[in-house]
UniProtKB/Swiss-Prot annotation:
Subunit structure: Part of an enzyme complex containing four subunits: a flavoprotein (FrdA), an iron-sulfur protein (FrdB), and two hydrophobic anchor proteins (FrdC and FrdD).
Gene from which this protein is expressed: frdD
Membrane topology: Multi-pass membrane protein
Name assigned to this protein: Fumarate reductase subunit D
Keywords: Cell inner membrane, Cell membrane, Membrane, Transmembrane, Transmembrane helix
Species: Vibrio campbellii (strain ATCC BAA-1116)
Length: 125
């Protein structure tokens, strides 16, 4: 018995898995890490729950120049930007702004620029 479907032996490769991976990583970071960062830096330290000395310039600078700190700062800046730009790109399509490849390149180039700037700024510290 012959199956009623055909298998494409030369499928077209897509770049979507790369963008979906960055989108998912950015969304996860933004949902799980960013609220804790805002809680600690924006609420607990100003209220005095966490000692202000823990956030002194020397300690924060030391953290930012360590590999873990640098990766944390880059992740905090870059990953949510990839998530947001992926949403903007697909949101434009949903709103019938069919920008095609130009819109895709503009969105992802902007996210790439922010990611590159995050890396550059880490090396400037």
């Amino acid at each position: 018995m012959k199956p009623n479907y055909s298998v494409n032996t030369a499928p077209k490769r897509s770049d979507e898995p790369i963008w979906w991976g960055l989108f998912g990583a950015g969304g996860t970071w933004f949902a799980m890490i960013t609220p804790i960062t805002v809680l600690v830096l924006g609420i607990l330290v100003p209220l005095g729950v966490i000692d202000a000395e823990a956030m002194s310039y020397e300690r924060v600078s030391e953290f930012a120049t360590s590999i873990i700190g640098a990766l944390f700062i880059i992740g905090t800046l870059a990953l949510p930007m990839w998530h947001a730009m992926h949403r903007v790109h697909h949101g434009m399509h949903d709103l019938k702004f069919h920008t095609g490849v130009v819109g895709k390149i503009a969105c992802y180039a902007f996210a790439g620029l922010i990611s590159a700037l995050a890396v550059v700024f880490i090396f400037m510290i």
